[in-house]
Amino acid sequence: MFPVLPQSVQAPLIWPQRESMEVSLHSTFRLTCRGQTELSWNGPVFIDDQTNSVKKGLFISTVTISNATAVHTGEYVCSSEPFNSTESTIYIYVPDPQTPFVPSMTPFENHVLTSYDEMEIPCRVTDPSASVSLIHMGTDQVMPSAYDSKRGFIGLFGAGTYVCRALIHGQNHDSIEYIVHGWTGGSDLRVELRAVKRTLLVGETITVDCVAKGSEVLEDHWKYPGKLANRGPKTVKENKLNLEIYYTLTVTNASPKDSGIYACSITDIMSNESQTKELTITVYDHEFVHINPLIGPVETARLDEVPEFKVDIESFPAPKVTWLKDSSVLGDDTAEISTTLLKIGETSYQGVLNLIRAKAEDSGNYTVKAEIGSISTSYSFYLQVKVPPVIVDLIDVHHGSAAGQEVVCTAGGSPFPEVDWDICKNLKHCANDSSQWMPLPINSTDITVELQMNVDNHIESHIIFHHLEGTVAVRCLARNDMGVVSREVKLMSSGPHSELTVAAAVLVLLVIVIISLIVLVIIWKQKPRYEIRWRVIESVSPDGHEYIYVDPMQLPYDSRWEFPRDGLVLGRVLGSGAFGKVVEGTAYGLSRSQPVMKVAVKMLKPTARSSEKQALMSELKIMTHLGPHLNIVNLLGACTKSGPIYIITEYCFYGDLVNYLHKNRDGFLSRHTEKGKKDLDIFGINPADESSRSYVILSLEGKGDYMDMKQADTMQYVPMLEMNEASKYSPIQRSDYDHPPSHRQFNDEAESLLSDDSAEGLTTMDLLSFTYQVARGMEFLASKNCVHRDLAARNVLLSQGKIVKICDFGLARDIMHDNNYVSKGSTFLPVKWMAPESIFDNLYTTLSDVWSYGILLWEIFSLGGTPYPGMVVDSSFYNKIKSGYRMTKPEHASSDVYELMMKCWNSEPEKRPSFHSLSDTVASLLPSGFKRCYERVNHDFLKSDHPAVTRVQCIDNDDAYMGVLYKNQGKMKTRESGFDEQRLSSDSGYIIPLPDLDPLSNEDYSKRNRHSSQTSEESAIDTGSSSSTTKREGETLEDITLLDEMCLDSGDLVEDSFL
């Protein structure tokens, strides 16, 4: 039983009773409608889940939406049936971050305006909280229009493209584009007439399109052969996007009567403007193909020409054209041959064959074939490529045989050449006098001539001399249309060898001797020569790409660096190379605080060449130019007179850094099994505990290995010169300068830094300290415009207190057998440590040293690993460096340290950090007190009586010398970017001395230096004998006075063959 309909129906009620509601994405929501009649729902999508019931006279309808998405956003309408007279609505929002705008079920029709009409742009959002603006794409301006999230933008809009932009949670989202067109006509009208095919066969369909652009209110008129017979229905299609209208005429089952002119006239009704276009259609009753050759039956081409052969083809439809040579199809895959088919007209074509640089083998029969289905036609011609004659071979087959002498001349060419023979009996004039050559008498009984073709299609002419007297010259001539060539051969009668044979043998021996000498000279030149890697920059080109280096031999050398040979005792060899060696020694009288000091002495081997001696002297001069610094191996003195050159430098207790890291690797790994603990130790230091922390960075370390200098106390030493009988040498002691008297006066914190605490072992803080100290040392070298060129862990030494010393150890290293050095020309280079500009452009600067510093960091934090592990220096390695390959982070480096490496490895040198910046960056990774402690140690070093410091002070205080300033020095200082005043305080007063007095003679010098001796020390070095090892009483005080004498001699300059 159905309820009775009331006379007045009220609007149904929707629950929940809201105008709009927001539901979650992918959720389920229900809407319930109650009314007095049957109910129906309408929504943004088809609703298939709807239940209806009747309770207490009320109709109830419920819709359920599962998995709500953006498409469910919209207005839901509940209507009373059957009249739909009343209805209620609710608007549902389903916010979807991925779909900010509601997808439209029907596409937006491009709106066309004749003026500014009010219209609606239906960009509705799924999130009601979104802020939406309308953007005009042409001007990128925001349009002042009101927005309704349930409808979109409504207002007056001009022609253009619009986009709705929604701002949701700080991000912009753009809708699809909405295009609004303005009406135009008259002057913009353009008409085009197109045909799918202009030539057809009987029975095909003719299709002609008349396209009108730029106007919309148009009228079309057609003229064509079948119009009177009412053939050809017309269709109209409008493309509103591009304002184009297509009028299409179609004529089916075409016949030859439909051939003719087809014309289309379009008239703009608004402006009455008209345009007419026409074209010609041809209908054939059968297919056809014909070839009209433009070449003859025989064609010629010269060698290396680019001949072109053409044929005209009349065909309908388009033909398939094939070219053949000697019945073989010529394909497009052959680079020397190209074939093309050009369309000249509707039924006119041209076939073209091109030979790229014609060759002899291109001669042959050519055919062009044109096909249309079962119809085909062809044309053939012969091509001859003309080749100049050539004599392939001319040999004396039976030289001096009993059967006579036979000469064979093999000749080729196209066309085949004719072969003739000439003979010359006066050998002295055959080369210069052509009249001496006469045609060979082939009718003679003593001569036989035969002609034949060989397997290579060459002409062979055989001439046999049955009886030959003396020596004659025979000439073979080959000639054809392209020219003539000839070759000669000398024939000798059988008998003793002529003088020519003897001369040839002597010539061969002479050539062998010359080649041997050249090989020996090349081998001698390729033998590597010793050269100091350090360079001092004199000037820089304006573009910064060319550097001029100071010639070290032009630097002055002050004799106050001289140290008496009899004050120096040599010991064991610390390192030996191809050119020289470094020997441990003890110096007496270098310093007041240390009458006896352990030192390292550089010297050449007895077999050294003059170039090596000059290089060692250059190294000495550069070291005197640099001055002292805590983190370089400082010069203490030199011996350059009355014997070989010795350079006396600081003694480094632990040897080089590579082997020190190898030696302590196991202990380091045992303490750092957990990387997190290591990072905490580096960066998680509690400032409150900092004062009580032991700075092991400068503490005494465990036993070294390579060049281990700690074993010196057990060795027996060799005195350089024999002293008088009363003189005694004391045993060589461990150098006390590593802890000079001035250092012992530090406060407790400094003493903690210099304590000999070997229990701590190698720590991560040590690795950072080494990194910082090397940066400070290189910062100092850069301030002196000095380029190292071989910065690597093997050239970094470690002294007591873990103080890093930068050096150049090339003299005492066998680089020819060291895998770290690669042969390039006559030298060996550390390629894996070199910057790209140094490898490829031979450019060395402070910035190329920065690259090497990055490689050194990798060595330190890999605990002495070899850079680019597993990679061989070859072309592949160089290509990887060019393409930007860089090493991965070493195991024990933090991300900050690795970032520093990558900055050093920037492919653009000017973008690499300076050493000043590098030292500041590394200092920020260390405890705050470390840098203060380092500066205090450095300050006390510069205020101590270290020989390197005191000798420089003597030179600085001497008014008899003036400084040398180099060109562009200010520019190079600027490139080093900010060397602060405090850091330069150690060397700001140091200048390169120039002599203004005549150098003293050796005689005068020997009078001043009462410790000098004329005894040669070569025998002492070579025999290894040792004098007494006890120093006589009172001699130390006399030796100390040497320092005072050095400071008093202001004019002593050393000058010999190497200065």
UniProtKB/Swiss-Prot annotation:
Please give the residue positions where the record annotates the modification Phosphotyrosine.
Y547, Y549, Y695, Y706, Y717, Y729, Y737, Y821, Y961, Y990
Q: Which residues form the active site?
A: D790
Extent of Basic and acidic residues compositional bias = 975-984
- Regulation of activity: Present in an inactive conformation in the absence of bound ligand. Binding of pdgfa and/or pdgfb leads to dimerization and activation by autophosphorylation on tyrosine residues.
Pfam families (alphabetical): I-set (PF07679), Ig_PDGFR_d4 (PF25305), PK_Tyr_Ser-Thr (PF07714), VEGFR-1-like_Ig-like (PF21339)
Disulfide-bond pairs as recorded: C33-C78, C123-C164, C210-C264, C409-C476
Q: Where is each Protein kinase domain found?
A: 568-942
Residues that hold ATP according to the record:
L574, G575, S576, G577, A578, F579, G580, K581, V582, K602
Give me any GO biological process, just one. roof of mouth development
Superkingdom is Eukaryota
Membrane topology, Cytoplasmic segments: 525-1059
Mapped to this chain, the residue ranges on the Extracellular side of the membrane are 1-503
Residue spans of biased composition, Polar residues class: 1012-1029
Q: In what residue span(s) does the Ig-like C2-type domain sit?
A: 32-91, 103-180, 189-282, 293-380, 389-477
Q: Which residues cross the membrane?
A: 504-524
Q: Which family does this protein fall into?
A: Belongs to the protein kinase superfamily. Tyr protein kinase family. CSF-1/PDGF receptor subfamily.
Assembly: Interacts with homodimeric pdgfa, pdgfb and pdgfc, and with heterodimers formed by pdgfa and pdgfb. Monomer in the absence of bound ligand. Interaction with dimeric pdgfa, pdgfb and/or pdgfc leads to receptor dimerization, where both pdgfra homodimers and heterodimers with pdgfrb are observed.
Briefly state the protein's biological role. Tyrosine-protein kinase that acts as a cell-surface receptor for pdgfa, pdgfb and pdgfc and plays an essential role in the regulation of embryonic development, cell proliferation, survival and chemotaxis. Depending on the context, promotes or inhibits cell proliferation and cell migration. Plays an important role in the differentiation of bone marrow-derived mesenchymal stem cells. Required for normal skeleton development. Required for normal development of the gastrointestinal tract. Plays a role in cell migration and chemotaxis in wound healing.
What protein am I looking at? Platelet-derived growth factor receptor alpha
